[in-house]
């Protein structure tokens, strides 16, 4: 499979998983993170979404130093999106560890949610800027 085809599959998968993780985030926010199933679903979706983000970056940059590559980008929004993603991921891992050990929600989870919503807003802008890709790849 050609790299462009892999990127197409990855981008469409990111779009779908991004919508699902956003819906899961809104549901958790609206219900105050009640119930164990919605939290585990959000964790599973987060793992899938994160794996797809790393795959997407890999398809663009291979294994070159990603931090150096992001610093050289012309578009500051893409750089911002990368750092917001990393911050959301780190806070999500910390909140998950706290939740699984203390069986209680921590303020880290709240911060993770707020930063995550900001990241998703930037991701939506990032996607809209590249909407031609999605329009040209409906096959």
What would you call each of these model-derived segments?
Residues 1-139:
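Membrane-embedded alpha-helical bundles that constitute the cytochrome b-like, heme-associated redox core
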């Amino acid at each position: 499979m050609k790299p462009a085809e892999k990127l197409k599959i990855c981008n469409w998968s990111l779009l779908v998983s991004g919508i699902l993780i956003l819906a899961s985030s809104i549901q958790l926010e609206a219900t105050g993170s009640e119930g164990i199933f919605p939290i585990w679903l959000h964790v599973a979706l987060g793992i899938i979404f994160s794996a797809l983000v790393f795959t997407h970056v890999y398809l663009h940059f291979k294994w070159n130093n990603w931090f150096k590559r992001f610093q050289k980008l012309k578009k500051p929004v893409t750089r911002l999106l990368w750092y917001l993603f990393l911050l959301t991921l780190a806070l999500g891992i910390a909140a998950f560890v706290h939740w699984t050990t203390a069986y209680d929600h921590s303020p880290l989870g709240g911060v993770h949610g707020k930063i995550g919503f900001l990241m998703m807003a930037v991701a939506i802008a990032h996607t809209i800027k590249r909407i031609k890709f999605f329009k040209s790849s409906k096959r």
